[in-house]
């Protein structure tokens, strides 16, 4: 499965939100857009100056020292740069804020978000209906952007798009070499508006290009998808992200698996970018027996550390299990994989070393509706090990060939795939998991 359509990362909203900043008054009455952005920048300078306590930031102080350099540069640009039409105060402020957060080195996690990005992320994590075309993507940059799966009841599901298709253009613009983040704004848009994708497809050694026009519509992306693999009677369950209903959807999938008396479960966390911490804890607890010293993770902050214990009532604590991860398994998904591996040593984790997130985020709203997410806690595996910037290493390292589209329960269910068809698809990581649960007899049993 490819990355989540909106690349949602892990965060924890359980703490009280910081106080909203007061609004400085400027000469001339009302506030211009530039003044609103300057307010946001002043808030960030307060962070840069180190003025924050355990509960909230004192945003009424004026920056001194190194932070004053930002305002000096800002004033010099506005006062002296000759091409005045090129000066975009909001763009400068957002760039400065992003650069400050990026300098922390919490790559792929602590970050700045515009109001639009924040709204889209919150919508996705609440599993609310979203507007788009309904595809999961992977690749980008040095690799082509590929459709890995299509969301049911979405515009893409009603088109001739297929998993494995490469998107090489959007509305006539060549996107080869773009990252998914760069291409996404071209694909997304307002409800009811059209978008034309240029698709490259290879079938039987023949490559063709054609255009597909879709109308962007509202749809709801699933959080958990599952498929009982015929003949093998193995439940293949994938968590796409840890949104607000992840555990509720997981329990439904596990109840169905238990009803079918499955022989084992494959928990696929590949390309899962994370989500809510409480949902990660709840999902991990479905597979781990609760008890003394049974923890999902350890949270370490400036003031000390605390443990998050395994919750009682898990539905699959005795079921044979294999977990799949890859380099895009991040944050909350890494918490789940690590918790299962530490608490159930008989369970094998298969795939590639994970992303290595390692921090718990807290949201700090800025005055114009944008926000910064800061890692205010580091999380550790139940044994005290940190995976920050190094990732979690699976028991069995298995790479997925570049030319192979990973199988997913979405695809398997849509196409009613047999066990043999799944094995023949060449998903080396999934096949390794099937062999792990069948003692190497998956192909024979299929």
What are these regions (language model features)?
Residues 385-446:
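Conserved functional hotspot residues or short segments at active or partner-binding sites
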Residues 366-378, 393:
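Short acidic, Pro/Gly- and aromatic-enriched capping/linker segments at domain boundaries
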Residues 97, 136-147, 151, 233-238, ...:
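PDZ/PDZ-like groove recognition
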Residues 81-146, 194-196, 200-213, 220-226, ...:
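Extended, small/polar residue-biased N-terminal targeting/export presequences
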Residues 23, 40, 55-62, 148-163, ...:
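Cleft-lining beta-strand/loop regions that shape enzyme active-site pockets
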Residues 168-169, 373:
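Hydrophobic beta-strand signal
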Residues 2-108, 143:
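Terminal targeting/pro-maturation regions of precursor/exported proteins
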